[in-house]
Amino acid sequence: MEVKDANSALLSNYEVFQLLTDLKDQRRESGKMKHSAGQQNLNTITYETLKYLSKTPCRHQSPEIVREFLTAMKSHKLTKAEKLQLLNHRPMTAVEIQLMVEETEERFTEEEQIEALLHTVTHILPAEPEVEQMASTEAMEEEGPA
């Protein structure tokens, strides 16, 4: 096998999750569950990939959310790879953003720029329901008794 163009397309975790889910549904509907060695390997890879992706933020995304996110990212002047990492991982702290965006100190001269990027990411991309519940519980604990 030969790779013609390594960067012809970048896929987000959401796109891979949707593609594999659709393929799985199509195979189930058609009743074609081939049992060749190659097909078994493909089924295993599909299962393991879906199992992993179902535990990531992509599970709660939609085409509209991805479109809105990419539109909002235009003002931040990020590379395609950086946007993809932010979309796939949904960072929740400035440190996580600094790990995903190269040369953050030079490109974002003010702390407010990183905070604005973080706000955009956390505002548009849905959080895991468990994470949102933990965050609201921690916020209530910090407020203390009234």
Curated annotation (Swiss-Prot):
Signal peptide from the UniProt entry: none
Main location: nucleus
Membrane-topology descriptor: Peripheral membrane protein
MF terms (GO), sorted A to Z: DNA-directed RNA polymerase activity; nucleotide binding
InterPro entries, A to Z: HRDC-like_sf, RNA_pol_Rpb4/RPC9_core, Rpb4/RPC9, Rpb4/RPC9_sf, RPC9
Pfam families given in the database record: RNA_pol_Rpb4 (PF03874)
Gene Ontology cellular component annotations, sorted alphabetically: DNA polymerase III complex; plasma membrane; RNA polymerase III complex
Record keywords, A-Z: Cell membrane, DNA-directed RNA polymerase, Membrane, Nucleus, Transcription
Family: Belongs to the eukaryotic RPC9 RNA polymerase subunit family.
Protein name: DNA-directed RNA polymerase III subunit RPC9
Origin species: Cavia porcellus (Guinea pig)
Species lineage: Eukaryota, Metazoa, Chordata, Craniata, Vertebrata
Gene: CRCP
